[in-house]
């Protein structure tokens, strides 16, 4: 049986719905195709509980080689790994590196598979640089072992330090095939002479098999509450200050005008802490405290239950990526409140696949007329426009399935495997009158530029300070070793002098 390693961001203490969903979707397809799937995870026991195996056999699991967060330390860790791969001799490892045994086990684990699939995500950037390097490490071992690597459903950047970009480019160029999930990532690949598929998110066809499945809560089992007959699903995490009250007022207005009660649904949270009432839940609590209309706040749930709730809504409002994926895949409109360039790039990508890229505005536009008008437009989509959402979803899933068929055929070594054509461009659905659309486009562009500039400045500064701290630590260690050496020499000299004095006294005593 063909053994394939699927790499996703799973097994985290803080459960992330989108990361789990992308990995599950990819793993299920490959298992159904008759392959033995090995899942890279941070927590084997957790992943065994949360992920059910498809196909004819259970999943196997392999621990990640965990990288430090600091840029200097992760760069050095990757260099030490390659030194071992080149020479077969384990180099001296700083304290921040994984142990020699962990590195050996990691290398042997990858060498035991027939192919590697780096499943979708938004980890290929400096913002989450340690996750980028963990994937680069897997690809590096595979490259030395001549094991094919396939990169699926990724977002590239937008923030990359020059060194991180070098690491990323080497990883992508070593891959057999690359698929990205938005047009901006595809253009980045073209600019860097990388052949890539203009693809879609790996969870675009996510199937919620067991909505009753629960997470490991610290105190008691958390049940999905009874939901209103008609509701707006809200997932936000970047809201603070006056924006809390402005979003609360907007949701109150949605209830009074459309009869849609707010259901707050988190996408990140630690189920073992406060019964899952962490992460997004905290932001949701703040908003409901300022509302006068009915609202339900739900702790973090398993991906299966989460998807069902998104797809039962009349509308989804979000500042996160995967709520838009799950909403639009069911033909339900979404309105995005964008906090930064990182989110703008990703959500614009998935919204663009459905022609809904105009239904976005910066988060700081809360308190203006634009969010309210976007919501009104989303809720008043014509029957034909809603039908077009379903047609576009068919195109999205058709491409994803064609990509996976190519992936499976390539993993099996079938020479006739051909990469599909990229996703077609959808006609944009109008969301605002022209004057407001011009304003909204301008503020979105301004947010993108300023946030991207801030992000790039942060990445460079973070790397510089990291290397300064590392070199300072190296200097201090060298200084300590020098002082210890000096002390040891002084001690040895003192011992020699003492022995000489004792010898002279002994000789002198003979002549008394």
Task: Show the residue positions of the predicted features.
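Active-site anion-handling motifs in enzyme catalytic cores
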Residues: 1-465
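Helical coiled-coil/dimerization "stalks"
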Residues: 466-512
């Amino acid at each position: 049986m063909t053994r394939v390693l699927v790499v996703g961001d799973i097994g985290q203490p803080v459960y992330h719905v989108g990361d789990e969903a992308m990995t599950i979707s990819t793993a299920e397809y490959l298992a159904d195709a008759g392959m033995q799937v090995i899942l890279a995870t941070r927590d084997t026991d957790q992943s065994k509980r949360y992920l059910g195996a498809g196909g004819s056999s259970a999943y196997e699991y392999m621990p990640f080689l965990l990288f430090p967060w600091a840029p200097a330390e992760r760069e050095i860790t990757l260099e030490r790994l390659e030194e071992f791969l080149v020479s077969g001799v384990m180099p001296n490892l700083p304290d921040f590196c994984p142990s020699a045994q962990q590195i050996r086990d990691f290398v042997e684990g990858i060498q035991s598979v027939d192919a590697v699939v780096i499943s979708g995500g938004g980890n290929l950037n400096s913002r989450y640089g340690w996750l980028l390097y963990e994937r680069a490490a897997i690809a590096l071992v595979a490259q030395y072992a001549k094991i094919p690597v396939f990169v699926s459903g990724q977002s590239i950047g937008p923030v990359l330090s020059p060194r991180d970009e070098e690491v990323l480019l080497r990883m992508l160029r070593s891959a057999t095939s690359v698929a990205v999930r938005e047009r901006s990532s595809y253009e980045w690949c073209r600019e860097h002479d990388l052949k890539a598929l203009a693809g879609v998110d790996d969870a675009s066809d996510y199937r919620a098999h067991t909505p009753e499945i629960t997470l490991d809560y610290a105190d008691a089992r958390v049940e999905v509450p009874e939901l209103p007959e008609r509701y707006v699903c809200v997932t936000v995490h970047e809201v603070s200050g006056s924006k809390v009250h402005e979003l609360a007022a907007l949701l109150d207005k949605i209830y009074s005008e459309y009869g849609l009660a707010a259901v707050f649904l988190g996408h990140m949270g630690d189920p073992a802490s406060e019964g899952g009432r962490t992460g997004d839940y905290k932001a949701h609590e703040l908003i409901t405290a300022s509302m006068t209309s009915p609202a339900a706040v739900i702790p973090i749930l398993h991906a299966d239950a989460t998807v069902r709730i998104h797809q039962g809504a009349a509308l989804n409002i979000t500042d996160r990526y995967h709520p838009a994926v799950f909403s639009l895949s069911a033909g339900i409109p979404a309105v995005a409140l964008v906090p930064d360039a990182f989110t703008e790039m990703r959500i614009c990508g998935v919204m663009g696949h459905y022609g809904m890229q105009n239904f976005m505005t910066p988060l700081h536009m809360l308190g203006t007329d634009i969010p309210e008008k976007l919501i009104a437009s989303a809720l008043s989509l014509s029957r034909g426009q809603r039908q077009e959402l379903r047609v576009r979803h068919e195109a999205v899933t058709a491409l994803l399935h064609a990509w996976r068929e190519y992936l499976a055929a390539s993993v099996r070594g079938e020479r006739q495997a051909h990469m599909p054509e990229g996703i077609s461009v959808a006609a944009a659905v109008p969301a605002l009158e022209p004057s407001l659309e011009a304003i909204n486009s301008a503020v979105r562009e301004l947010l993108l530029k300023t946030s991207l500039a801030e992000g790039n400045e942060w990445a460079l500064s973070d790397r510089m300070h990291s290397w300064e701290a590392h070199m300072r630590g190296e200097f201090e260690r060298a200084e300590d070793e020098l002082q210890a050496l000096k002390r040891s020499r002084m001690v040895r000299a003192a011992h020699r002098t003492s022995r000489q004095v004792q010898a002279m006294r002994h000789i002198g005593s003979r002549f008394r």
